[in-house]
Amino acid sequence: MPATRRRYSGEAEVSGLPSFELRPGVAFPDWAAVTSPAAVDALTAILSAFDLAKNWSGYDDEEDRVRQAVIEGLAELDGGPDAEWIAARTGLDEGRVATLLGRLAARDLVVRDGGSNAIVGAYPLTTRSTEHRVGFGGKVTHAMCAVDALGTGAMFDADVVIESRCRACGGPIRIATKDRGIALDSVEPEPTVVWSGNRYEGACAATSLCTVIAFFCSEAHLEEWQGANHPGAEGCRLTPDEAMQVGRALFAPVLTHAAGAVGRMA
């Protein structure tokens, strides 16, 4: 992981758009990252699905610390973190960590296995195999969806290489970032687009919303897939850059601090 992190500018709060203070000086989402009307629409739909006001009400510093540790563990550990690892990482008692993990799962910020109760994800990352592989820092992990993959670099302040597949034909899609994860360096194939669908069920985005946010190698393949699988479904067609804007807005604030603060990650 990078030794130093980009400081958060504090410019994310935009009047009239849903936002809350994630930690002092850091607003979620970072609306300053979103410049395209289509990206604004997609981000607004995602926040509406998650019910920002309800599900984030009362979110506190201990939950924030545990959530950060879970995400860092998903990036660092092959099998993901457990309560013991998180306790060592955060300095919190293991019993307290267990309670906080339950609260985060209820908010749909941590995803657990229905049988073993093991941690299997925290947006944007998951231990489960998905079509979105994200490589950085000598490690490869999986992202929940296309937007999550595109936001991972900004979250970790690192350039990433995304290897995914067209949801329609299965053809390979490769995207590389630059400027420490906040801009696109290359997109192959060039006509690649992202579909950001609207579907939230069972209080779990990983098994609903994330399944309809995907890469397509061309607009024609997106249209074919929609016609065959989701005719009339609501959502937004995004360019890779627009989808990255949404990913940055959602995930750049997750591990960062306000300008002038000391970075959390070592």
State the predicted function of each range.
Residues 2-38, 141, 158-161, 172-266:
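Long, low-complexity, charge-rich intrinsically disordered regions
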Residues 37-68:
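Short alpha-helical segments that sit at the start of domains
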Residues 57-63, 114-137, 179:
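Short, cationic-aromatic polyanion-contact patches
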Residues 76-90:
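Short acidic, hydrophobic short linear motifs in intrinsically disordered regions
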Residues 91-106:
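Short amphipathic alpha-helical interaction segments
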Residues 105-116:
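A short, conserved structural fragment
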Residues 122-159:
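Short, amphipathic alpha-helical interaction segments positioned at domain boundaries
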Residues 166-169:
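Short cysteine-rich clusters marking metal-coordination/redox-active sites
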